[in-house]
Amino acid sequence: MRIEFVPVDTQAGATAALAVLAHEGAALSPEARAANEATGGALARAIAGGRFTGAKGQTLDIVAPNGLEAARVVLVGVDGSGAVEPEAVELAAASAFQAVKTSGVVELVLKLGADAETAARAAFGARLAAYRFDKYRTTEKAEKKPSVQVVKIAAADPVKAQKAYEPLAALADAIVFSRNLVSEPANILHPEEFAARAKGLESLGLEVEILGEAEMAKLGMGSLLGVGQGSVRESQLVIMKWMGAADKSAQPIAFVGKGVCFDTGGISIKPADGMEDMKWDMGGAAAVAGVMHALAGRKAKVNAIGVLGLVENMPDGNAQRPGDVVTSMSGQTIEVINTDAEGRLVLADALWYTQERFKPQFMIDLATLTGAIIISLGHDYAGLFSNNDGLSEKLLAAGKAERESLWRLPLPAAYEKQIESPIADMKNIGGRPAGSITAGLFLQKFVNGVPWAHLDIASVAWKKPSADPTVPDGAVGYGVRLLNRLVADAYEG
């Protein structure tokens, strides 16, 4: 799909849909009023007969009445009665696209506000709504295929709007990259392939280094390597660097991602029902790769590190067993009670490596870590755990701004008893009570004096069904927007 910015007097044409806004109570925007007048009040009559109220995200899609150069007209509700906020424009553009994407029209003309920032945000919403992962489909009914090939956004100054869209386009590219990683089947996206795709981002100016099992063994990463020892696919540690600050020696920020490219549970094997979804157990690593893509794509003025721990958790004769004891890079020993609590074992070494090598300002890890977070928070919030109030507040604010919501949960020392082991320094699981919290407490043992936050994104990495028009069913790309906003608002010089 192609994005174009066009003058405000552009007509939709015979094969296009026109989208305009309506406020709460079905009050028409200036663009909608003009369309209504051109049709002799036909839009107002359609509203009266269609129970359209102008509620946020509500759409009314009709065949274009006489008087308009268009095939269809889409009214999109945005609530309120005054100025339309950028978020509302983004959602309205996405809703309009969803309303007509398979209607047969080949163009969608968005007249949602003429200033450059509004037009840019509309383009961003449409771009995200157009995401579709169907590369392996060889047959599909024509009426189910997306027909919209071009989205034209009306702007008072199309050149200025295009300029305003550039950083959002870079962010959209990064979100799509992350969604594609999560959507790929595990026979395609194994650790080596994931690492290769990360390496491909060097074209954006990133530096990418890949450590294999031999290098990790020399570093003493027994915790991470134990997870992957049952797979024929070699585990990988990917280090991504973006040095965008004026001072290249300035202390970087760091993101660490869990990348279990497929999780059978290992010897503690999962039930067959739903196991296919475990292809997205690398959603944390996909988010980290995505935010590094975004920072490089928009040339962010910050030094940033992304570290991806990539493994497959498979059961074979060489697989890790319940009861095994492994030694992490930190020197701490771990009794593996359950091989399906593997993500924290990967992160233990990845976190330690990151802080020891790069001495970052802070570390944020992202992981589809626990099913317990879904029980706690449902599918609208990710869990936030942190040793630093300031970092937590910045993350919460960024999440609210980008509709990637977080809820902070505690890390009470009293719960550490649940992960005590009689034969090692700790065990990797603490039982059913407070499962997300004890997982966070486990990770905290591998953080040595660095401000740190852990985002448990198991609840939000995959949405089906999705209620957000910018997130089609499936991979969300959760974390890319959130962390990009965090950097832009708080850490760019």
Swiss-Prot record:
Reaction equation(s) it catalyzes: Release of an N-terminal amino acid, Xaa-|-Yaa-, in which Xaa is preferably Leu, but may be other amino acids including Pro although not Arg or Lys, and Yaa may be Pro. Amino acid amides and methyl esters are also readily hydrolyzed, but rates on arylamides are exceedingly low; Release of an N-terminal amino acid, preferentially leucine, but not glutamic or aspartic acids
Keywords, ordered alphabetically: Aminopeptidase, Cytoplasm, Hydrolase, Manganese, Metal-binding, Protease
Function statement: Presumably involved in the processing and regular turnover of intracellular proteins. Catalyzes the removal of unsubstituted N-terminal amino acids from various peptides.
GO BP terms in the entry: proteolysis
Gene encoding the protein: pepA
CDD domains with a match to the protein in the record: Peptidase_M17
Positions annotated as active site in the UniProt record: 270, 344
Protease among keywords: yes
Matching Pfam families: Peptidase_M17, Peptidase_M17_N
Residues annotated for Mn(2+) 2 binding in this entry: 258, 263, 281, 342
The family this protein is said to belong to: Belongs to the peptidase M17 family.
The protein's enzyme class: hydrolase
Molecular function (Gene Ontology), one example: metalloaminopeptidase activity
GO CC entries: cytoplasm
Binding site for Mn(2+) 1: 263, 340, 342
InterPro entries, sorted: Leucine_aapep/pepB, Macro_dom-like, Peptidase_M17_C, Peptidase_M17_leu_NH2_pept, Peptidase_M17_N
Record's cofactor remark: Binds 2 manganese ions per subunit.
Name this polypeptide is given: Probable cytosol aminopeptidase
Keyword NADP: no
